[in-house]
């Protein structure tokens, strides 16, 4: 079973200030010819992934299309957010679109979705792929998997989830704390 990657690329991505231009989101900043959106697109070229859904806004549409072409994606789906409403509505819209598409193709909803931020940098991608491969077999209709990292210090720029260990490296989320606005 292939995983449907959903790339969330609608945010302003401003946490690199003062190292970024005023009107350039973090995911589009060039780091030696390689942007964070390029790294994200490259990350989902493995055989375990289906073609991507990209959730973005009209402001980034041309840039997204350029990066998809640069990374040789022939099949993809772009969902335009009508206005900036944070992460949850973007996830919901993309999930509904993916389920609708899955139902049209397969007459049932069963393809797992993997939501990825367009502006993440990963140094140890093999751990990411291992976690997906390991957990894809544990999915069921009642649960979702959230991949996270242990914070090294408190920050008001990120949300947190509190967990309870169930087995091995699998924890149950007990509470999610959204970042303050």
Question: What is the meaning of each model-derived region?
Answer:
Residues 8-11, 157:
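Short glycine/serine/threonine-biased micro-segments
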Residues 122-181:
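Conserved core of the sugar-phosphate nucleotidyltransferase
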Residues 8-9, 55, 114-117, 146-150, ...:
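Short beta-strand segments
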Residues 28, 78-79, 144-146:
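Conserved beta-strand scaffold positions in the cores of enzyme catalytic domains, especially
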Residues 1-7, 14-18, 22, 34-115, ...:
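Conserved N-terminal catalytic core of the sugar/cofactor nucleotidyltransferase
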């Amino acid at each position: 079973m292939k995983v449907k990657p959903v790339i969330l690329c609608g945010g302003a991505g401003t946490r690199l200030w003062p190292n970024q231009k005023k009107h350039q989101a973090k995911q589009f900043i060039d780091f030696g010819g390689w942007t964070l959106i390029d790294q994200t697109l490259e990350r989902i070229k493995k055989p375990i992934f289906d073609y991507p859904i990209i959730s973005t806004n009209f402001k980034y549409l041309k840039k997204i299309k350029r990066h998809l072409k640069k990374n040789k994606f022939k099949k993809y789906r772009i969902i335009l957010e009508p206005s900036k409403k944070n992460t949850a509505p973007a996830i919901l819209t993309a999930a509904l679109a993916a389920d609708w598409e899955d139902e049209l193709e397969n007459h049932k909803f069963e393809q797992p979705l993997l939501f990825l931020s367009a502006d993440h940098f990963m140094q140890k991608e093999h751990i990411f792929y291992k976690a997906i491969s390991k957990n894809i077999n544990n999915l069921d209709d009642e649960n979702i998997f959230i991949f996270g990292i242990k914070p090294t210090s408190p920050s008001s720029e990120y949300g947190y989830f509190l967990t309870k260990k169930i087995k091995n490296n699998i924890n149950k989320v007990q509470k999610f704390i959204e970042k303050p606005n």
